[in-house]
Amino acid sequence: SSSNTIYWYQNDGSGGFGPEQIVTTIPASPNSVSAADLDGDGDLDVLASSSLDDTVAWFRNNGTGVFGTRRVISTLVDNAQAAYAVDLDGDGDLDVVTASFNDDTIAWFANNGSGSFGAMQVISTLANSARWVWAEDLDGDGDEDVLSASSLDDKIAWYENNGSGGFGPQIIISNNANGAAFVTTG
């Protein structure tokens, strides 16, 4: 929102939603927000990327829908456009993959299982103005491969995961996706 506030709305189970509840108000513009169990405790936490402060962070859910303070994963995601939670190294916890607009980088951060994350691991720097990331097992080998959308090169691409978090070179799906901003599967 324009107030840099992240909200959530509780589903009542019949398609209706309760009142707006604040997760956090952060000092920088959130670009992507999603829910994922990042600390392995069985409830959904909030993952967010912020473009103005180059930050990817998460907010721990205490189990009752109350969220803690911002837990920074990285402040090195240059103009952070997207963050997506997925198990990239096959250890059973959710890691985080990111898209950096200013430095054309697709990268990931390994989760230690309790919501602490390791250093940035670069997958590629060939996504010119990276806008979005997603993961799916594209080659049917049982691990999650990474997809990216980048706007200045009009590209949708993917990166083959070797099963333990190592990635092959960029494989272009299309370089005619005019101003590519999103990619998903389904």
Where are these regions (language model features)?
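Hydrophobic beta-strand segments that make up the repeating blades of beta-propeller
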Residues: 1, 46-50, 96-99, 146-149
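Short intrinsically disordered, low-complexity coil segments enriched in acidic
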Residues: 1-11, 16, 186
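Calcium-coordinating acidic loop motifs
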Residues: 12-13, 36-43, 62-63, 86-93, ...
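A short loop-to-beta-strand structural motif that recurs across blades of beta-propeller domains
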Residues: 5-9, 55-59, 105-109, 155-159
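Extracellular beta-propeller repeat domains
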Residues: 3-5, 51, 101, 151, ...
